[in-house]
């Protein structure tokens, strides 16, 4: 870890505990900062908060001490990415011109290990996992490692102290995290895709959302690389305006891109890299994710043998077209990460077999007309639950689906979907909606889906 002096003896307020709040607090202590930790939750019995308190951190829980920002001098406010900028502490810090930063920027500023950053509306976690595995396969030959960190669930601050200059950090970075970033310099940055109707409750407008995503490349150097989606022309034009890095592109269909999906192979302008039939992950979107991972991994030193070793064995990230089981000839997949319409549009065409689809969730005020052509082509029957069940049913009727079953809960939906199938079919859980009407997170929703599938085996 670099012994930077940026935060040495500086007064810093960490806003929001959580996983990343705890990790960045520990890192800042190592860097010599004077810390105050604040969370609106009561922290008196919180083990992590008390652990920090024992190390000299001032811990304030149960409320936001807005006046404290005026009464005392703070050099930085480190904000948990999930906390909106409307938060009174954040607003007051802005009024007082206190720099507001996030955990990734703090951690990456002192990383000895080179790092790559991957973001996107859909596909970033799978791409991060593929990239990390390929690079780890490459680095293990010399006794070193690639670490998957960031929005994937492992705070960057947790890994930076142990990662050496010969390791590589593969960082999944979200729009929430990027919004607060002012200066990161990944060796390679990538935007897998950008879609509308994603996190607009946080960013307010699509333009704000795109601007946040572009922070992944905005402060790169001219000898760094940026991987861009050749098929999203409007976004590509903005990326070309903003990015100072050397650009490489990938495409599903256009063979003018640097990396593309050929008839039988994943290809670059220079070579055929890997036979598509040998890749375990289902769906065209996962071939695109694979192209991004390949582009990054090659720039960081991996070869085709490293790539083949991973792509021929990796079966997917949890909750992302995750294969669950085969039950009486029916393959069952958990795609709970499908929290928006765009995610469902890549999951539904992923299979050649007839599909019974389970969908539904939080109503964000959208129609589902964009799914009608896919319903018509791929879905033989559909089971719907949650706040959006009737809106989805309208789209299913427009598609001419004859068997439309409406239930109240996911627990009811799973056995009903099984009843509609026959051997050779696929049961696909791809909600096309956020989980918050009935579940706390998409992970919790996916775990319950798997549990309900297991219950089918006992009936």
Swiss-Prot record:
Alphabetized GO MF terms: ATP binding; UDP-N-acetylmuramoylalanine-D-glutamate ligase activity
Ligand binding (ATP): 120-126
Cellular component, GO annotation: cytoplasm
Places the protein is found: Cytoplasm
Keyword ATP-binding: yes
Keywords: ATP-binding, Cell cycle, Cell division, Cell shape, Cell wall biogenesis/degradation, Cytoplasm, Ligase, Nucleotide-binding, Peptidoglycan synthesis
EC annotation from Swiss-Prot or TrEMBL: 6.3.2.9
Pathway note: Cell wall biogenesis; peptidoglycan biosynthesis
S-S bridge residues: none
GO BP annotations listed: cell division; cell wall organization; peptidoglycan biosynthetic process; regulation of cell shape
Reaction(s) catalysed (UniProt annotation): UDP-N-acetyl-alpha-D-muramoyl-L-alanine + D-glutamate + ATP = UDP-N-acetyl-alpha-D-muramoyl-L-alanyl-D-glutamate + ADP + phosphate + H(+)
Pfam families per the UniProt record, alphabetical: Mur_ligase_C, Mur_ligase_M, MurD-like_N
Superkingdom per UniProt: Bacteria
Keyword Cell division belongs to the record: yes
Primary localization: cytoplasm
SUPFAM superfamilies documented for this protein: MurCD N-terminal domain, MurD-like peptide ligases, catalytic domain, MurD-like peptide ligases, peptide-binding domain
PANTHER family recorded: UDP-N-ACETYLMURAMOYLALANINE--D-GLUTAMATE LIGASE (PTHR43692:SF1)
HAMAP family xrefs: MurD
Membership in a protein family: Belongs to the MurCDEF family.
Function of the molecule: Cell wall formation. Catalyzes the addition of glutamate to the nucleotide precursor UDP-N-acetylmuramoyl-L-alanine (UMA).
Protein name stated in the entry: UDP-N-acetylmuramoylalanine--D-glutamate ligase
Gene: murD
């Amino acid at each position: 870890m670099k012994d930077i002096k940026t935060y040495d003896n500086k007064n810093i307020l960490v806003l929001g505990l959580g996983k990343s709040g705890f990790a960045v607090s520990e890192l800042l202590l190592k860097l010599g900062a004077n810390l105050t930790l604040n969370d609106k939750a009561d922290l008196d019995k919180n083990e992590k908060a008390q652990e920090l308190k024992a190390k000299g951190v001032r811990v304030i829980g149960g409320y936001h001490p807005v006046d404290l920002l005026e009464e005392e001098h703070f050099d930085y406010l480190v904000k948990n990415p999930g906390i909106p900028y409307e938060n009174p502490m954040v607003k007051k810090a802005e009024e007082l011109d206190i720099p507001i930063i996030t955990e990734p920027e703090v951690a990456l500023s002192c990383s000895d290990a080179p790092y790559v950053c991957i973001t996107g509306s859909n596909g970033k976690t799978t791409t991060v996992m593929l990239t990390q595995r390929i690079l780890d396969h490459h680095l293990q030959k010399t006794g070193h490692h690639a670490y998957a960190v960031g929005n994937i669930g492992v705070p960057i601050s947790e890994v930076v102290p142990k990662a050496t200059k010969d390791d590589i950090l593969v960082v999944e970075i979200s729009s929430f995290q990027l919004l607060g970033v002012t200066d990161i310099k990944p060796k390679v940055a990538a935007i897998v895709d950008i879609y509308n109707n994603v996190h607009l409750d946080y960013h307010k407008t699509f333009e704000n959302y795109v601007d946040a995503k572009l922070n992944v490349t905005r402060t790169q150097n001219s000898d760094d690389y940026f991987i861009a989606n050749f098929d999203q022309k409007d976004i590509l034009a903005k990326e070309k305006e903003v990015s100072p890095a050397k650009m490489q592109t990938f495409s599903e269909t256009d063979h003018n891109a640097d990396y593309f999906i050929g008839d039988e192979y994943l290809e670059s302008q220079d070579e055929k890299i890997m036979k598509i039939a040998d890749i375990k992950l289902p769906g065209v979107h996962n071939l695109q994710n694979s192209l991004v991972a390949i582009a990054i991994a090659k720039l960081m030193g991996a070869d085709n043998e490293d790539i083949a070793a991973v792509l021929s064995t990796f079966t997917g990230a949890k909750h992302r077209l995750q294969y669950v089981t085969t039950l009486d000839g029916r393959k069952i997949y958990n795609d709970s990460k499908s929290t928006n319409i765009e995610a469902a549009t890549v999951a539904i065409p992923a299979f050649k077999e007839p599909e019974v689809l389970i969908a539904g969730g939080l109503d964000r005020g959208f129609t589902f007309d964009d799914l009608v052509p896919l319903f018509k082509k791929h879905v033989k029957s559909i089971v719907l639950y949650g706040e959006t069940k009737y809106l989805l049913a309208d789209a299913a009727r427009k598609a001419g689906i004859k068997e439309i079953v409406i239930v109240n809960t996911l627990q009811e939906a799973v056995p009903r979907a099984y009843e509609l199938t026959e051997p050779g079919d696929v049961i696909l859980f791809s909600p096309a909606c956020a989980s918050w009407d009935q579940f706390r997170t998409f992970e919790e929703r996916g775990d319950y889906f798997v549990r309900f599938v297991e219950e089918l085996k006992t009936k």
